[in-house]
Structure formats: structure tokens, C-alpha cells
């Protein structure tokens, strides 16, 4: 074979490999974002809530009233957008993010979609979710290359369900409408809320200030994954800068962290950029 012929064969081979890579990337990206849209539809099509609960402790009813939830609420989903910073491990540099989230009101379900610029021109897409009996955390570079994929299992479900419970401060109508939540009054400023059955059972505490706003959340045993190892760790969050939006009293600032050997590690800090509530039946 001549030198020219060898060059042609190599060029064709490289072109073929490039074409295969492009097709693979397109298929992977379409699969990933198609999955996101499927999860989104599932949360948005959550069932229409039944009448507000009448079996709640008076302290929970008082909190709902404080947050602006009317007795005749028929809220179905909450939609919000966020911006902020995340830290992957103690001492790491902060990663800026923007996110949008849909949270179901009458059942434990949500989808969080975030975009983090790892470096110039290299975004990471992250989804965190509970939908039906499925829960997961996934991240993809460019929406093509999977970096993290943790899904299903009772431990995963517990962790994500605990996030739903912690975010009741952004989902106040769920206090009256979500019959999957079990409440206990621990003292005048502490409410415990739980959900799930069997090995999926989980509980957090909502800490109120003197005015009755939720300013802190706590859990003793939220699953934390490091590599392939999962351990239960103390978990906490703080909230503040309450404002009234669409009749609901919502904290615009929040941060979340782990308590590691009695030292706080804040891994998420964010701000609510927009918030809205959708009510009534699915159209």
C-alpha cells in the first residue's frame, strides 16, 4: 500500500471513530435529558390533594397558619429556582450552581435539576429526586458522561425523603395536605416529622424561633455516601430571610451541612430566586 493509501485508511478510520463518538454522545445526552423530562412529568402530575388534614397537632396547624397556608388550600406542586454554592468535600473550592426544583405537595416527591460549571465550557448537570418508589442522585458532564449514579434502595430513599421533609419550609401547604407525613411535638419549639415504612422510615426535626418560623432542621442519621461507603451522619440545615410570596411565608436563604466529628461541614448554601405554587387538577 502506498503512503497516500495508508493515510487515507487512517483518515477514514479516525473519521469513523469520530462519527461513532458523536452519535454515542447524542444518544447519551438524549437519554439523560429524556429521563429528566419523564421524572419532571411524574412530579407535575401528582394527584390532586384531598381535603386538608384534621388529625394534626395544634402546633403543626399553627405553623401552617404562620406560613400563610389557608384552611382550604388545594396546592398540588411548588416550583422554585435557586442559585448558590456547593462544596464537594471539606476544604474544597466552592462550585457555583443554578437550579430549578419541583416539589409535590400531597405526596413525598420532588425533582431538583442543577447546573454546575466545573470549568470553562465544562458544565455538570445534576439531578436529585424522589418520584414514587424511586429515589436517586445523578450527575453527568455535558449531559453525556456519567459521573455519579446512585439510585433505588431503601438507604437512598431515606436520604432523599429526608431532604423532602427538610424542605417543608419551601413547601408549607404540605403541612396540611400531605397524608404521608407523621408529626410529633417534642417541645414548644421543636416538631418531629417522619415518613416512610419499614427500612425506609426516616425522621427529622424542625426547630422554630420565638416567632414561630422554622430556622433550623436536624436529623441524627441521614445516609452520607463517600465513595462506596455509606454511613449515617448527623445532618442539619439553617434558614432565614423570610419573605411573603404569593401569600406564603418563605425563607429565601438556606444552608445545609453534615456534623463530622462535632465539626460543621456546610456543603450547600443557596438563595431562592423565584417561588410559585400551582393548585387544582392536572390539565
Question: Predicted regions span which residues?
Answer:
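Gly/Pro-enriched, hydrophobic low-complexity segments
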Residues: 192-279
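N-terminal mature ectodomain segment of secretory-pathway/periplasmic proteins
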Residues: 62-65, 69-145
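Flexible, processing/modification-adjacent segments and terminal tails
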Residues: 138-197, 230
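N-terminal leader/targeting segments and the immediate start of mature chains
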Residues: 32-79
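Short, exposed beta-strand/loop patches in secreted or surface proteins that constitute
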Residues: 100-105, 127-129, 179-186, 206, ...
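Short, Lys/Arg-rich N-terminal segment immediately upstream of the first membrane anchor
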Residues: 1-7
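Short, hydrophobic/aromatic-rich segments at coil-to-beta transitions
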Residues: 74-81, 105-113, 135, 185-194, ...
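Hydrophobic alpha-helical topogenic segments used for membrane insertion/localization
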Residues: 7-24
Amino acid at each position: 500500500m502506498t503512503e497516500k493509501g495508508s493515510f487515507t485508511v487512517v483518515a477514514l478510520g479516525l473519521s469513523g471513530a469520530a462519527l461513532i463518538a458523536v452519535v454515542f454522545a447524542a444518544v447519551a445526552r438524549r437519554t439523560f435529558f429524556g429521563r429528566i423530562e419523564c421524572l419532571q412529568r411524574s412530579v407535575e402530575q401528582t394527584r390532586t390533594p384531598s381535603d386538608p388534614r384534621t388529625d394534626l397537632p395544634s402546633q403543626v396547624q399553627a405553623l401552617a397558619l404562620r406560613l400563610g397556608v389557608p384552611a382550604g388550600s388545594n396546592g398540588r406542586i411548588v416550583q422554585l429556582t435557586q442559585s448558590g454554592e456547593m462544596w464537594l468535600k471539606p476544604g474544597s473550592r466552592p462550585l457555583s450552581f443554578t437550579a430549578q426544583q419541583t416539589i409535590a405537595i400531597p405526596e413525598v416527591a420532588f425533582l431538583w435539576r442543577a447546573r454546575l460549571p466545573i470549568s470553562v465550557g465544562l458544565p455538570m448537570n445534576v439531578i436529585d429526586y424522589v418520584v414514587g418508589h424511586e429515589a436517586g442522585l445523578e450527575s453527568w458532564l455535558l449531559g453525556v458522561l456519567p459521573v455519579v449514579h446512585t439510585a433505588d434502595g431503601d438507604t437512598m430513599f431515606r436520604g432523599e425523603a429526608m431532604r423532602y421533609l427538610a424542605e417543608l419550609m419551601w413547601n408549607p401547604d404540605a403541612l396540611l395536605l400531605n397524608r404521608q407525613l407523621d408529626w410529633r411535638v417534642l417541645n414548644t419549639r421543636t416538631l418531629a416529622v417522619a415518613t416512610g415504612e419499614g427500612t425506609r422510615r426516616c425522621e427529622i426535626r424542625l426547630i422554630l424561633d420565638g416567632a414561630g418560623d422554622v430556622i433550623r432542621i436536624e436529623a441524627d442519621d441521614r445516609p452520607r455516601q463517600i465513595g462506596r461507603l455509606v454511613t449515617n451522619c448527623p445532618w442539619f440545615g439553617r434558614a432565614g430571610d423570610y419573605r411573603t410570596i404569593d401569600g406564603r411565608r418563605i425563607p429565601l436563604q438556606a444552608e445545609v451541612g453534615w456534623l463530622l466529628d462535632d465539626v460543621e461541614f456546610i456543603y450547600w448554601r443557596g438563595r431562592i430566586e423565584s417561588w410559585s405554587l400551582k393548585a387544582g387538577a392536572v390539565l
